[in-house]
A protein has these predicted regions:
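C-terminal structural segment of proteins
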Residues: 1-326
């Protein structure tokens, strides 16, 4: 591990001032410190922002939430306002990592965690995300757990966060403090597809600090489902965050986002469009899933993710509609 200095920020303004010359923000450190040990990340300075006053979950009168970026994953999942009004978010958080890691990991850090692609984590191997221009050996190598949607010749990595998938389905917004002041962006605009710059995971600018996540009221049943290679402490092969409002047998509103299939949480806009106003039947859910997955471009060894994602969409929607087994 490269030598580094450690500083604790006392405010957002102080954090911005300290973020220069190779500095990196430190929250819980559950991903960053691992990457430092591997030599993937080599910051010269860590600026600790975990103790800034962003550690609360606020329930607004309209049922929306403001979640501070320093809230731990454990506290978020246990918060009664989250468990009652945004079940999909609590479920997603509890399906990520282990209890010990959730105790340390923060909301802001969870959103910014980096891919678990084995080539990215091995500094002896080329990787366009870690070393731009060096190539993407995963395309012809080990990629059974990598992307089937939105990837590019430069990168087939997937985003690892369960929480981010749920927040995408919830139409969350990200509150950011930057050098030009504060701004709020849709979570859809936070993470990037790889394109020809896979080293850029997000649209954040130098020094930008996530301070909170705003989550609108939901008002319909929701669920998070995750398929993984073992029962716990494993990243998704495919996951889904779903919410469904059925009235008089018709889909009034629906939210769908997929994890484990793309470089970012994949909002299933095509499937949502196909479902609104349709009958809430498994046949309609099947057609919507197929419409979404028409864009899939599986590689040699991850084609199984297409039927897996399709079946997960259909099963989860059927559960929410009361037409399938839970």
């Amino acid at each position: 591990m490269r030598p580094f200095t450690y500083e604790r920020a006392t405010s957002a303004e102080d954090a911005l001032e300290r973020h220069n010359g190779g500095a990196v923000y430190l929250g819980g450190g559950t991903n960053l410190v691992d990457l430092m040990r591997l030599g993937v990340e080599e910051p010269g300075r860590l600026v600790d922002v975990a103790h800034l006053p962003y550690g609360e979950v606020e329930l607004r009168p309209d049922g929306s939430l403001v979640i501070g970026a320093a809230v731990s994953n454990s506290d978020l999942a246990a918060d009664p306002t989250v468990r009652e009004g945004h079940q999909v978010l609590a479920q997603a958080v509890l399906m990520g990592a282990s209890g010990q890691i959730r105790n340390l990991a923060t909301v802001g850090g969870n959103l910014l965690q980096r891919t678990r692609c084995s080539y990215f984590q091995d500094t002896a191997k080329p990787c366009n995300k870690r070393n731009p221009g060096s190539g993407c050996p995963a395309r012809e190598g080990e990629h059974h757990n990598l992307a089937i949607l939105g990837h590019s010749p430069a990168c087939v990595a997937t985003h690892p966060s369960d929480m981010a998938v749920a927040l995408a389905a919830l139409n969350a917004s990200i509150r950011i403090r930057g050098r030009a002041g504060e701004r709020t962006i849709p979570i859809e605009d936070l993470h990037r597809l790889p394109g020809d710059e896979p080293q850029r995971d997000t649209t954040l600018e130098d020094g930008d600090l996530i301070t909170a996540v705003e989550v609108p009221a939901l008002g319909m049943p929701s669920r998070y489902r995750k398929v993984r290679e073992r029962a716990s402490f494993a990243f998704a092969l495919v996951s889904i965050a779903a919410a469904l409002d059925v009235r008089d047998g018709l889909v009034h509103d629906v939210r769908l986002a997929l994890g484990g299939v793309a470089h970012k949480p994949w909002r299933a806009w095509r499937a949502e469009e196909a479902l609104r106003g349709a009958e809430a039947t498994e046949e309609a859910f099947q057609r919507a899933a197929e419409a979404e997955l028409e864009a899939a471009e599986p590689l040699r060894d991850n084609g199984y993710k297409v039927p897996l994602a399709r079946n997960l969409i259909v099963r989860t929607l059927a559960e929410l509609a009361g037409t399938g087994e839970s």
